[in-house]
Amino acid sequence: MNSNSTIGRTTLGESDTISLSFSEPSSSLNSRSTDVVFASTSTLVPQQGSLTSLPPVSSTATPTYYSTSLTYDETLHTSIDVSSTSTLVSSTDSSSSSEQDTYSSQYDPATSSYSIITPSMSIFSSTSPMSSSSSITSEWSSLTSTTPTLSXSATSLSSSWSSLSSPSSLLVSSSLSLSLSSSYSDTKLFSFDSRSSIFSPSTPTVISPSYTYLSSISATSFQISTTSELSXSWFSTISSPSTTSNKDTTFPSSSRNTSTSFYSSSLSSTNDFSTISKSSKLSPSASSSTVSISTISVPTSSSVSSSSSKVPSNRPSSSSSSDDTTSAYSSTYTFQSLQSTTSSSIPPXTQTPSTSTISTSPIPTSSQVFNTXAISSSEDSKTIYYFYTQTYDITDSSTTFVTGLPTTIAVAKSEVTSFSAPSSTITADMSFYQHWLDGSLDNNKNQGTSKTNTGTIVGSVVGSVGGILICVLVVWFMLVRKRKAKRHFKENDSFCHEIGRRTGFPTTAQAKEASLQAQDSGSQQRNTETASANNPFSNEFNFKARGNPPPVPPPRNVTAXNGSFQNMRSNFMDQENRFSYGSSFTYSSLGSSTQGGFSTLSSNSIRLGXGLDNDISHDERNTVQNNSQGFLREII
């Protein structure tokens, strides 16, 4: 006996996709204006090292008008996609799922501050970094589902057959419930704080401050909650009639599947944006302030709900299967937005520039106590630096106050063993205090030190060069003087000077000067001739003024054999012995020595004979010895 059986299989496929999106642009515009004070009285309250009392200070400022605008544009776009797919390959399916997710984002307050000092002093800008943190916290998430595992529960199945059997029925019932709950909360807090000060001093002691305070806070929070519920139920009937035959057995079967699906979703969002700004206005007359507050609030809310239902029906058979699905989908969207704007501001008033003069009466000064005993120090390899507070009495024509200024003293380690801060008070004027405030006091000291060092260097260089020049001049003067003295000494020790000194004329310079003066004038020449009569050496170097030599005396008994020699001697005497010194030098001494006589010349000894003759008597020789020229001849 052969039997073939075919059992039908029911397959249920379900896919639902829901996409929700919405965008919400919102913008806000906020304008503010602030008037700056014309004239006001300000009081400086500095820290350590600056003004500690409260003197009145007059200030004058010109009005400044400015306005700022803030535009905030926010666009929110949210897209939610929900997709679920379930497949049933069984006759019984039971599943349940529950999930809840919470998303939270918290932004810390961010503060940015800056200050501008105008118009001619300096610009200072400081910005604190913006800090933000984002955290995603999942409160709880649980999922209990038996759909993927396709486990069967609460199922009753009964089937019986026999050769003569009756049909039995199968009832399958299933319910699926899906609940999704999601909440989204976002809170933003933005804080902006700006303070600016404008100093426009017209005199060194006049300071005009003004300030503007702006605070803006925007908060945005919205919550998205989505709840989804999915319920499905279907009915399945399996009929199994049975017939018995001798040859084959056939099990025809029929199935009917009915499914109903319902999906509902709701979405709600709330957005609240608010801006608060505050500006201050100082009145020039009463020094009062006016506060202008501008608030913009833009709350929005939206809700979206959707629902869907599906009714699939399947009727499979043993040999073929068909799928007939009937679905119905409906969705409802509800959007509600509420925007409210509240603004309150004071428009700027046009005011003409004016100048106010405030006369202040002297205020009694209060005694100030400064901790001058506190001393701190630092040191390096050679120097110790002491830091303490010095008390100053600042005096002006209308203001007097006492303040403490930090002071630094540098002392060498080898010169100090202990140090104590001075307790006396130093009196200074307002210009000193003003220089200390703007930092130019130390610059002036440095400049003075630099100028002193420069003057020292220049003076050293000039003094060195001058000293070298003076030393060179002194050495040159000494060398020239020594050269002159040496030349004069040579002239005094010469042969001519010795002869002139013996004859009553100690120097030869007088003869030189007399000969030069004789050429210049006739009177001096006559005086020179008069002096020449007494001084045989006056015309020593004046060769042109000399006359012809005297005639040669006749020879005494000269023999013929000596005639040729006498002529030659006469010619020689005429050409060579023309000078006074040469004329006095004759050969008479030679002749006398050869003949054995002494001074046997005639009375005229200017041109003496050769002295070679031997006919001179002894009486004539004695007469020549008495002549005045014999002494000069013996000297030569």
From Swiss-Prot:
Is Ubl conjugation among the key words of this record? yes
Low complexity bias spans:
19-32, 87-108
Quick one: where's region Disordered? 1-32, 87-109, 237-271, 299-326, 339-363, 510-553
Q: Where is this cross-link: Glycyl lysine isopeptide (Lys-Gly) (interchain with G-Cter in ubiquitin)?
A: K512
Annotated compartments: Vacuole membrane
Q: Which ranges are annotated Polar residues under compositional bias?
A: 1-18, 510-541
Q: Which residues are glycosylated?
A: N4, N257, N492, N557, N562, N626
- What membrane topology does the annotation report for this chain? Single-pass membrane protein
Keyword Cell membrane carried by entry: no
Q: What is its main location?
A: membrane
Which residues, renumbered to this chain, carry the PTM Phosphoserine? S628
GO CC terms, sorted: vacuolar membrane
What are the protein's UniProt keywords?
Glycoprotein, Isopeptide bond, Membrane, Phosphoprotein, Transmembrane, Transmembrane helix, Ubl conjugation, Vacuole
User: Superkingdom of the source?
Assistant: Eukaryota
> Which positions, given as ranges, span the membrane?
457-477
Family stated for the protein in its record: Belongs to the TDA7 family.
This protein's name: Topoisomerase I damage affected protein 7
Q: Which organism is it from?
A: Saccharomyces cerevisiae (strain FostersO) (Baker's yeast)
Question: Which gene carries the instructions for this protein?
Answer: TDA7
